[in-house]
Amino acid sequence: MDNSYKIKVQHVTKEYDLYKSQAEKLRSFFSLSNSKVPHFWSLMGISLEVKAGETLGLIGVNGSGKSTLSNIISGIIPQTTGTVEVRGDTSIIAIGAGLRGNLTGLENIRLKALMQGLTNPEIDALMDDIVSFADIGDFLYQPVKSYSSGMKSRLGFSIAVHVNPDILIIDEALSVGDDTFYQKCVDKISEFKDEGKTIVFVSHSLKQIEILCDRVAWIHYGTLKEIGATETVVKHYREFTKWFKGQSKKEKKHFQRQMKANQKAFDIDAYQQQVIEERQANDPNDQNVAAEVKKDFYGSVISEKMSWGNRFLTIAVGIVFVLACLINVSGHSLGDVLQNPGNIVHPETVLHDTNATSGVK
């Protein structure tokens, strides 16, 4: 791997816990071990680079991890392990990505542009071009939740390409909409390519991939099956899909179950050890390989799972909050409660004898 990349992904994995219900998720929070919770690895050690000015296509079957990878690169979701280095501002285009359903199209344009770092005067200058490119008519003033998927794609694409990002990530955004808008999008992408923009293009349409992409990465059930010249990788992917379609219904289900089982059984520790051994073989004199690999795996990752220290702290804060509420409702002071904690649950009741006091003047 050279140093001319715009995007560098190294040893990236993504793990999800497969909770069957919210109750099971809550129980796991208080459990001493999460070994009983099934895990699913959407990505299992992806390493690749995207060069400056290159258009890289991502292909693969449904559920292979293409969108997961594009979301990690764009910073929408974090990776479980590995490093992601992006040299420049990214803008992702996916159906409805980043659009707020309760806001109008016009309000979403301003919000997304502000989030990309544009000022209000800059947005005002671009507004007519964005509106014209999206071409959604009076729906511009309606809440986005009333839009069709094609209209959401139009609006999202128009916003993304007009904020002038360094890196454009397009995730199935051209799969909806009419031919006229599709051609406008292709022309805009071609214009970006001519300007030397870096593009990651996710699509199920191999024709789109062949037209737009310089290289292609085939993501296959969480792994990088192949990366290389568009013609070569697309040819191999077509051979795979032809083979798969030729299987019986039973054989297809068996193949898919086996692939999903591999993703559930993936061992991150074994993968880490494999990387260590490969590096040691390449450089036997390096005594710090294990530490370097650990840093590559976890050095830039913020854990999505709570440590036990944080769990205990959260529980303690929750208990203190509940006690504070009970003290407030009971009407007693903190000192009274500390002397007689039972007052919180069974507050003392003082009975007054109205007959005894009625004659006092």
From Swiss-Prot:
Domain of life: Bacteria
Annotated membrane topology: Peripheral membrane protein
GO CC term (a single one): plasma membrane
Disulfide bond positions: none
Subunit structure: The complex is composed of two ATP-binding proteins (TagH) and two transmembrane proteins (TagG).
Chain's role: Part of the ABC transporter complex TagGH involved in teichoic acids export. Responsible for energy coupling to the transport system.
The protein's name: Teichoic acids export ATP-binding protein TagH
